[in-house]
């Protein structure tokens, strides 16, 4: 059990809290006794019981307070470390704005150019990794893992605790780096990057060790073997693993796999998107500094980035087909997944695939507080400019609430249009940031036009936005598109942008039918006052994750996360995610030291009498699996006879 360390201030605060609670309780008891003397006199036993219960409750509160560690155990006490902030992460940074914000630069064909999507400011150029670079990374990681794989949990927890404290104390810097490279707002970064990452670290510290303990399994059912044979699964590191992560959460998507890899005793080579190389370099350096501060090998974590494959450069495919990887987690799009799976198959590397989604937000007739729901819908659709794999892609509303909810949302977006821009330097108040690039603007506009041509109504937005302050920024108008039907392209394809799509359903079953009509199956939400009906919908949705009367809460650390159908397969997160990065070694052993397996004489080579050997095995099987006590006794006599 972990030791608890309380400083003097905490002890004084604890004492004063308990004393105040106790004094309040005494005051209430005295008031009762003064106001009802006769009742007290006639119910001394009741008062005694009440006093005892209150005392037990007070003791329980005290124990709960003390048993909640204020600091980590000394075995993994966090280590402080620092990291210089990059120049572009400084507040009010005056970076040069580029005419072209493409990652390609004809003058430097082997380099990746990085820009701030919100402003167009140039962040720097980085050489695309070569096949030789990849080999070196895998080799270094493998060498570091050979020692790290045998580390005890206190060393691993020390690294995570140190990382936890750094993130908690440097939120502004981390958010600014993430925003500068992705174009999102500081608020979106705080919730989508920092909060969820700290939760993952803290959950792993608190529950991860228990998940990786050997798992004893019941059995065998064989009557003879069950008395002296035990079986368990021991979870061992795989070695060097890889994670190929998307750009929409440059901090969280990068750190999530690293946290899981380090805790399970693995080394990891992370391949970030070419869109967020600048921030990924800083974040991986943060991890390596943390490892160094904890006296661990920083080579445990490596960062790779490559330009998309061409005839002259196939490094990206070389990475995913590398035989040094024992496991790959991919977060990205469906088209890219096909290439990754094809490459990974060359070395038989297992892959967890987390792809896009077309998550439905279902509002049933029993849902009442539509104003509150409109706030959830707005946040779930427009956060990070809609670039969220579990963002709301379709709002499916049963007929009783449809028109009212459409009006509420349209009125909100008309009266208070979402302000677009950049708040990285806190120069203005904004609601929605930029998109990562303008590469998909033609596609988004075409989806809207197709829907309108087929009968949908465009109430807000629908096209790209030329920002007056940031003409090089990548902005798309917050869009409200209603009366969408399944035959429209926007109902079947992932938008991954700030387009609020609304679909009208006839009834609850029609809500489910519409939700399941898309080829994806990542997540979904259902809202209503009838819990039985909500559970019916949740059980009927063909998805990997569902939230009831909430949005995206299935992305909590204790649950495995992943989709089905066109959204991929496999899970990361939760206990299952940790176990998936381990070799589940099945071990069978003797539980009684004086009993061991021997080959019976009738079965020993060479077989001296086939008939006797057959009868021996037959009697053994009967004795092992019969439900009749008499049959088992007879088999024992037969075994004794045939064994001679």
Swiss-Prot record:
The GO biological-process annotations, alphabetized, read as: reciprocal meiotic recombination
Specify the domain of life of the species encoding this protein: Eukaryota
| Catalytic center residues | 354 (proton acceptor), 389 (nucleophile)
One of the entry's Gene Ontology molecular-function terms is:
aldehyde dehydrogenase (NAD+) activity
Q: Which UniProt keywords apply?
A: Endoplasmic reticulum, Glycoprotein, Oxidoreductase
Q: Which CDD domains match?
A: ALDH_F15-22
Signal peptide positions on this chain:
none
InterPro entries to which the protein is assigned, alphabetical: Ald_DH/histidinol_DH (IPR016161), Ald_DH_C (IPR016163), Ald_DH_CS_CYS (IPR016160), Ald_DH_CS_GLU (IPR029510), Ald_DH_N (IPR016162), Aldehyde_DH_dom (IPR015590)
Endoplasmic reticulum as UniProt keyword: yes
List the glycosylation sites.
15, 565, 627
Q: Where is this site: Transition state stabilizer?
A: 248
Question: Which additional comment does the entry carry?
Answer: Present with 2500 molecules/cell in log phase SD medium.
Write down what this protein is called. Answer: Putative aldehyde dehydrogenase-like protein YHR039C
Identify the taxonomic lineage of the organism of origin.
Answer: Eukaryota, Fungi, Dikarya, Ascomycota, Saccharomycotina
Gene for this protein? MSC7
């Amino acid at each position: 059990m972990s030791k608890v360390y309380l400083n003097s201030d905490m002890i004084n605060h604890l004492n004063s809290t308990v004393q105040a609670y106790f004094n309040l309780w005494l005051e209430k008891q005295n008031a009762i006794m003064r106001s009802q003397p006769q009742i007290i006199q006639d119910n001394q036993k009741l008062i005694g019981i009440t006093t005892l219960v209150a005392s037990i409750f007070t003791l329980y509160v005290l124990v709960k307070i003390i048993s909640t560690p204020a600091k980590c155990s000394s075995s993994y006490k966090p280590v402080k470390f620092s990291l210089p902030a990059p120049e572009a992460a400084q507040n009010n940074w005056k970076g040069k704005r580029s005419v072209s914000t493409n990652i390609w630069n004809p003058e430097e064909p082997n380099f990746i150019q990085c820009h701030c999507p919100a402003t167009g400011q140039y962040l720097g150029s980085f050489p695309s990794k070569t096949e030789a670079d990849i080999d070196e990374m895998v080799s270094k990681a493998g060498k570091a893992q050979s020692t790290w794989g045998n580390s005890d949990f206190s060393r691993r927890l020390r690294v995570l605790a140190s990382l936890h404290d750094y993130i908690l104390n440097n939120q502004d810097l981390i958010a600014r780096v993430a925003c500068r490279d992705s174009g999102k707002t500081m608020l979106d970064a705080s919730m989508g990057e920092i909060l969820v990452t700290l939760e993952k670290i803290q959950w792993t510290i608190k529950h991860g060790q228990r998940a990786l303990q050997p798992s004893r399994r019941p059995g065998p059912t064989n009557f003879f073997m069950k008395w002296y044979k035990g079986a368990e699964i021991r979870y061992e590191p795989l070695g060097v693993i890889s994670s190929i992560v998307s750009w929409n959460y440059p901090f969280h998507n990068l750190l999530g796999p690293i946290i899981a890899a380090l805790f399970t005793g693995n080394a990891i080579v992370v391949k970030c998107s070419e869109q967020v190389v600048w921030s990924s370099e800083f974040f991986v350096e943060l991890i390596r500094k943390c490892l160094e501060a904890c006296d661990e090998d920083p080579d445990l974590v490596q960062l790779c980035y490559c330009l998309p494959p061409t005839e002259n450069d196939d490094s990206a495919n070389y990475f995913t087909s590398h035989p040094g990887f024992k496991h790959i987690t991919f977060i990205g799009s469906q088209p890219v997944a096909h290439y990754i799976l094809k490459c990974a198959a060359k070395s038989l590397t297992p892959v967890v695939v987390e792809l896009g989604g077309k998550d439905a937000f279902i509002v049933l007739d029993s849902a009442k507080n539509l104003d509150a729901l409109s706030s959830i819908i707005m946040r779930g659709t427009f956060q990070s400019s809609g670039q969220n794999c579990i963002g709301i892609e379709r709002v499916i509303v049963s007929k009783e609430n449809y028109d009212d909810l459409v009006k509420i949302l349209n009125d909100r977006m008309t009266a208070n249009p979402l302000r677009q821009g950049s708040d990285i330097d806190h120069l203005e108040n904004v609601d929605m940031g930029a998109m990562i690039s303008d590469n998909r603007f033609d596609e988004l506009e075409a989806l809207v036009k197709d829907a309108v041509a087929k009968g949908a109504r465009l109430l807000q937005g629908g096209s790209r936005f030329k920002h007056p302050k940031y003409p090089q920024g990548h902005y798309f108008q917050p869009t409200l598109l209603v009366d969408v039907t399944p035959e429209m392209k926007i109902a079947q394809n992932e938008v991954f942008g700030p387009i609020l799509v609304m679909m009208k359903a006839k009834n609850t079953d029609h809500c489910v039918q519409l939700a399941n009509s898309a080829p994806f199956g990542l997540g979904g939400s259902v809202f209503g006052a009838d819990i039985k009906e909500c559970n019916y919908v949740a059980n009927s949705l063909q998805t990997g994750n569902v939230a009831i009367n909430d949005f995206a809460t299935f992305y909590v650390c204790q649950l495995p996360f992943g989709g089905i159908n066109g959204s991929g397969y496999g899970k990361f997160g939760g206990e299952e995610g940790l176990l998936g990065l381990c070799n589940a070694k099945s071990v069978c052993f003797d539980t009684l030291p004086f009993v061991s397996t021997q080959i019976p004489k009738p079965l020993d080579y060479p077989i001296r009498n086939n008939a006797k050997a057959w009868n021996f095995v037959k009697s053994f099987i009967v004795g092992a699996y019969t439900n009749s006590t008499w049959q088992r006794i007879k088999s024992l006599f037969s075994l004794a006879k045939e064994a001679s």
